[in-house]
Amino acid sequence: MKRQLPSIRLAIKTSLNGVCLALVSLCALSCWLEDRITNGSESMFLFWAHVFSVFPGQLGVFLRRAYYRLTLDRCASNFYIGFGALFTHRCALVEKDTYIGPYALVGSAHLGEGCLIGSRASLLSGTEQHALDEQGRWGPCDKARLRQIKIGDYAWIGEGAIVMANIGAGTMVAAGAVVEQDARAGILVAGNPSRFVRKLREEPQTQS
């Protein structure tokens, strides 16, 4: 009986994923129609993103996952997205085994395999979404100025961190850090602005 439990759980999970895909399909269709009719507007996409972000419990996880599988440019079928978390742009990419904590905010980003996004972290679409006009006033977000950032495989973004640049594979961003410059793979960065702290894994020594 114990040997059958994993297969039973998998069957239940697969069935729930299918049911949730069906439940959100009309919502996803409205986003698709909006994109075609309005030449790229994301108002409907954001409306449903906010609606599904506040569904509690495991049902909410399944609904959010189903919604983004149908609306993002690419989205794996096995990832976790917590309560209050949402994507702000359809152009995001999500690889398998990614974890997105509660209240995280993800813009135009490519989330690598197995990366961890901590609670209340913000992944912004670069550093130049807004521009000053001739009168010195800041304008609204300009989609033409968005830059897709890359979070490398198995990187860890700490709670409350703000990331506006690429993060290398296996790198850890400390809680509350503000990252404006690219961080290479396998290191720890912390602070505002973020600074290199140390390597997370020493390179093997070669004997001569």
Name what the model sees in each region.
Residues E159-M172, A177-Q181:
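Beta-rich strand-turn-strand
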Residues V54-A66, D73-R74, F83-E95, Y99-I167, ...:
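Flexible, glycine/small-residue-enriched loop-and-beta-strand segment within the central core
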Residues V189:
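Conserved active-site beta-strand element of glycosyltransferases/polysaccharide synthases
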Residues R184-A185:
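Conserved beta-to-alpha transition
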Residues K2-Q4, D35-I37, A85, L132-A144, ...:
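A short, terminal or domain-edge coil/loop segment
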Residues M1-D73, G136, Y154, N192-S208:
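Terminal amphipathic alpha-helical/low-complexity segments used for targeting or macromolecular assembly
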